Each structure stands twice: as C-alpha cells, then as structure tokens.
C-alpha cells in the first residue's frame, strides 16, 4: 500500500546529512509506493515545512533538498501506492500523505475499512475521501498525547495500519503504532538521528548500524533523550495451548509442563505414513487419556507425496551405526519441511478454534542435527506468526523444552510426573524400541545419565 517514514532528530546541527539520508530512504521506498510522496517537518517551535508531489521522489529529488534546517526536529513522510478502493482521478495536495491536523501529523500504511463509521462516531470532518485522513482530526479532538489513550482510539479501527505520528506541541518525540504492518527503527549515532521506515532494506544500513524491527500490535513512543516507551495493542493472555505431540519424550514433557503451569492444553498429532505411525498413534492416545486432555489427529498423505526420507514406510533403512550414536549426531532421517508444515497447520487451527498459543517438543538436543529443531526456528516462526494470522488474532509460539537437552528433559519429566512410560521414541514401528536408532540411543543415554531405569522395553 505505502511506505511510512519518520525521523527523530537528536543532533539538529547534522541536518544536511540527515536530509540526504532521508532522501535516499524515500527513493528506496518507491518499492512500496510510486503514486505520490510527501514530507512534513516539525520545527522546534511547532511550525511545519512540507513538500508534497505526485509521482516518484527519484524523479523530483530537487523538491526535497532544503526542507530541513538547524531547527528541524521531527520528519513524517510517505510514499503512496494508491489502492483501487481509494483512486482519486484529480488529486490535490489534500489527497497526498502525510495528513496534517491542528496538532498531529500522521503517515499511514494500510487500509481503514471503517473510516466512514469512525467519521460519524467521533464527529469529525476530513478534507479528502482517503481513509487515512480521518485519523488526524480524531487525534486532535480526542488524544492527549499519552500512548495508553491512543490505544483506546486505535482499537476502534477496523483494518490494517502502521502509523508514524508527529506532535506539534511536543516536537521532541515521535510515535509509532502498528498492527501487522511492519516498521523498522535505526539509530544512526554518527548523524544523531533515529530513522523509521517500512522495510529495513530502505535504510541501507551497515553491519554495525543498530536496526530493530518494532513488534507487531504495539505502540512505541521515542523521545530525543533516547527513552522508549512501549505498550501492546492486544491484552490477550495465554490460556489455551495447542501442543504438537508425537507421542515421544519431548512433546509429552512439554505438554505435561504446560498443564502443570495451569494452561488448558490440547494435543495435536499427525499421522503421515511414517514407520512408527501406529506405535506413535497408540502412545499419544494413551498420553492424552492419562493427562485427561483432548486430542486432535490429522491424517495426511503430503509427506508421502514429498518423499525423499527414510522415515516413511518404504523409504529405506534407518541408520543404526555405532548403536544409534550416528543417527543422534546427524539428520539422516530428515523429512523435508516437516516441522514448518506441522507448525503452519497448528497455527491455522489455533487461529480458527481460539487457541492462544501453539507449542511443541522442539529441544536443544535435536537442534544439533535438525535445523527445524533449532530454537531460532521457533523464534523466527513466532515472528512470522502475526503475518500469517488474521487481524487481531495473534497466536503466540511457545517452546517449553526448547533450551533443554535430552537428559534434562527426562529429569524434568520425572519431576513433574509426565507419563514417560507411555511414550514412544523409536523411528521403527516394532513391538519394542529397536534400541539402535538415533532417538533410541538418546533416550537410553538420557535415562542412564539420570541414574534411572527406562520404563520402556528394547529389542536388544
């Protein structure tokens, strides 16, 4: 839709260099908007200077030079891609962002679907049909500059947004409010300025620059003393958790741990034509019954279609060299994108059926061999989550045993009373654990390290 840009100037004496960097950001931001661009600068005394034009800044760069001076404090800017629903044939300056109110200046990326309703509810008048133009008069009339009050106003907006807001009465600060629309922040210590824009690529930052992605569903206030205040737009507390459960040690301990912490959990199990499908299914059913929690099963042929893994029936032999140590140290039984697919399905179910979070048995031990067991996989998926769910339906991603190795998981499981005796860890689907695959090796060693007898039986 658009790219939003903002700058909070800490060292006004560097205004010429800051101006050059701003222009470069706006030129790169044409990636998200080529129909018009605008820049409004708030001076120390609250007065403003502005430039607005149709088309691209790269073809009209000369209009931007000289917009800053030694008294400039806050810059609010926009590169607009005009959506079909807001096409204006004969545009005037009033149709070009940023929009200016008596006190507040606003640049907006997104769509406000209920702009007409907001206009009536707050009894305000805007000067253009553009949806974003309804925001400054509402803020002028109802917002006192405190982010807690801004939250109440933003909760009335139906749609998507990333706002960057300047305050003429307090030109020593800048505000950023967003749901799932992205905003990045970069502090340029050398220039003495804090830059904000829609994608980090627009900064052209070096490896040593401080670049931060601001959290979705948050409001951030930054002042020129380098103080940051932040609140969350959503007050949702985590109560219901959907746990991806294989029937093995890790997910069983993870589920039990969450249950003991007071969460309402449901187990989610996938049957995907893997060698141990029947044994895992039997195990997870008994575990759900033991913990007295619901179980959701999903049967899928997807991995049979993908193939290229020995973990599936008919897929080849499981590696059992060195009594299983070889399988514990390398991902011989890798299943392409399995955890990503499991997590994506879990996320969809969580959103659809009102779960607050998803979790699994991903752990530090298996991260040594499997990329999708790495803690970073979970962290990155958690960051993806707000962009994969509907507006205001944020689903958290938890990893209860993500920082534990196998013997620590066994120790925790014993301490919290997890039904370890019901679990199935083996890659094979025999009557007993084979004792020679990677998971069997790790399981046996984990119990041995803890000085405990493993409650399951092995063939050897």
Swiss-Prot record:
Record NCBIfam families: 7-cyano-7-deazaguanine synthase QueC
Keyword entries, A-Z: ATP-binding, Glutamine amidotransferase, Ligase, Metal-binding, Nucleotide-binding, Zinc
Pathway(s) where this gene product acts: Purine metabolism; 7-cyano-7-deazaguanine biosynthesis
Assigned protein family: Belongs to the QueC family.
Name of the protein described by the UniProt record: 7-cyano-7-deazaguanine synthase 2
Pfam families: GATase_7, QueC
Organism: Sulfurisphaera tokodaii (strain DSM 16993 / JCM 10545 / NBRC 100140 / 7)
Position of the signal peptide: none
Residues that, per the record, bind Zn(2+): 426, 434, 437, 440
């Amino acid at each position: 839709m658009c790219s939003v840009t903002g700058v909070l100037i800490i060292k006004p004496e560097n205004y010429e260099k800051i101006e050059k960097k701003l222009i470069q950001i706006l030129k790169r931001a044409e990636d998200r908007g080529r129909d018009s661009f605008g820049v409004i600068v708030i001076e120390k005394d609250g007065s403003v200077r502005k430039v607005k034009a149709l088309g691209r800044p790269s073809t009209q760069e000369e209009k931007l030079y000289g917009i800053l001076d030694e008294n400039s404090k806050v810059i609010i800017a926009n590169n607009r891609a005009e959506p079909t629903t807001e096409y204006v044939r004969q545009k005037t300056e009033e149709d070009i962002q940023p929009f200016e109110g008596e006190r507040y200046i606003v640049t907006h990326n997104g769509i406000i679907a209920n702009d007409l309703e907001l206009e009536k509810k707050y009894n305000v008048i805007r000067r253009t049909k553009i949806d974003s133009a309804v925001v400054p008069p509402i803020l002028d009339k109802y917002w006192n500059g405190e982010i807690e009050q801004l939250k109440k106003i933003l909760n009335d907006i139906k749609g998507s947004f990333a706002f960057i807001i300047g305050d003429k009465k307090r030109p020593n600060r800048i505000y950023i409010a967003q749901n799932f629309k992205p905003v990045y922040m970069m502090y340029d210590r050398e220039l003495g300025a804090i830059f904000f824009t829609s994608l980090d690529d627009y900064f052209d930052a070096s490896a040593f620059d401080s670049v931060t992605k601001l959290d979705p569903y948050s409001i951030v206030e930054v002042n020129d003393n380098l103080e940051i205040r932040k609140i969350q737009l959503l007050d949702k507390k985590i109560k219901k958790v959907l746990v991806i459960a294989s029937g093995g040690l890790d997910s069983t301990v993870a589920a039990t741990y969450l249950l003991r912490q007071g969460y309402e959990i449901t187990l989610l199990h996938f049957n995907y034509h893997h060698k141990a499908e029947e044994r895992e299914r039997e195990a997870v059913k008994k575990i759900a019954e033991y913990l007295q929690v619901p179980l959701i099963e999903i049967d899928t042929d997807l991995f049979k279609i993908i193939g290229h893994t020995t973990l599936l029936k008919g897929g080849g032999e499981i590696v059992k060299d060195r009594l299983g140590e070889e399988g514990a140290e390398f991902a011989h039984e890798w299943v392409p994108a399995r955890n990503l697919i499991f997590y994506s399905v879990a996320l969809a179910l969580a959103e659809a059926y009102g779960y607050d979070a998803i979790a699994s048995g991903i752990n530090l031990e298996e991260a040594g061999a499997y990329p999708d067991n790495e803690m970073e996989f979970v962290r990155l998926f958690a960051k993806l989550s707000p962009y994969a769910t509907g507006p205001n339906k944020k689903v958290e991603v938890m990893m209860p045993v993500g920082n534990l190795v196998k013997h620590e998981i066994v120790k925790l499981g014993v301490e919290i009373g997890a039904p370890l005796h019901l679990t199935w860890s083996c890659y094979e689907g025999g009557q007993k654990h084979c004792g020679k695959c990677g998971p069997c090796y790790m399981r046996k060693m984990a119990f041995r390290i803890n000085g405990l007898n493993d409650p399951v039986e092995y063939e050897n």
